[in-house]
Amino acid sequence: MNLVAALVLCFALLSSVRGDDTTNTIDHDQVKPFPQPEPVTISEKAAVKYKPQLEIGDGCVSFPAVNAAGEITGGLKGTKDTEACTEAPLGSQVYGRSTWFQDKWAMMYSWYFPKNFCAYKAAGRHDWANVVIWIDNPAAENVTFLGASLSQQTLEPIKLAILPMGTRNEEPYQNQKAIPMMAFAGAERITTGRVGRWSYTYKYVAGSNTTMRFSHSYPGTWGWIDMTFADSDGESQDLIMWNQLTDKARAALESADFGDTQVPFTDKNFDTNLQAAWPF
């Protein structure tokens, strides 16, 4: 092959790769979410019945990450705080996947955010967060909630001068077998009296027996934004299960590069994450 032919071939290959990237990545606010299908199987019905609410305590609202054609969100540069991500104009999405894991039924719910946040400011492009809800049997009319595992980022905190703004999480999940009453939608804490200058008495009103509520917010310390239990109700998004996605959407999520964060429910990540989320 002469030099000219080699250069032409290289240019064609580079153009092909560049064209594929452009075709498969679109603006974060142009990704159309999947409508929630009517559940058919036992696992789909359970996933819809126990779909949690998401409250946005800090950072961006959740956005869809992929459309039916397999086009992936390009996210947003980690600057300018919540600019361009306070509302998902086409609607949001929660992604689900469930399975038996050892002798428990695991339901993973995942959300995508176009910016990541650390130390109360935008600090990166892309963020995936998820929770795993553990129950005894998806076919039961009234299930027993066995635990909940909330994802947390294990990245090194950003630094101000030479000081890290927070501490690094050692584990990718906060795993809990005891689920607080206030973690359920509709639950209330009502102040009933005052017993000191800063002390009060409360009564608690139970909420839903099917729907939990989680918050995407800072967990009370400096560091990266994470999943926490919410004390107030959030919103529900259309749920799409892994096996309900189009083939193109699944393939795109499997191969997409989301930088420092990963799609938690893909074939290459799902089992590993369930192992890390195991609270028993």
UniProtKB/Swiss-Prot annotation:
A motif (Hepta-peptide GHRHDWE motif) lies at residues 123-129. The keyword Glycoprotein applies. Secreted effector that contributes strongly to virulence during infection by P.capsici. Its main location: secreted. Belongs to the Necrosis inducing protein (NPP1) family. Residues 1-19 form the signal peptide. PANTHER family: DOMAIN PROTEIN, PUTATIVE (AFU_ORTHOLOGUE AFUA_5G00600)-RELATED. Pfam families: NPP1. The keyword Glycoprotein applies. This is NLP effector protein Pc553546. Keywords: Glycoprotein, Secreted, Signal, Virulence. One of its GO terms (cellular component) is extracellular region. Key residues/motif important for the effector activities are degenerated in most NLPs, including the nlp24 peptide consisting of the conserved region I (11-aa immunogenic part) and conserved region II (the heptapeptide GHRHDWE motif) that is important for phytotoxic activity. Glycans are attached at N142, N209. InterPro entries: NPP1. It is found in: Secreted.
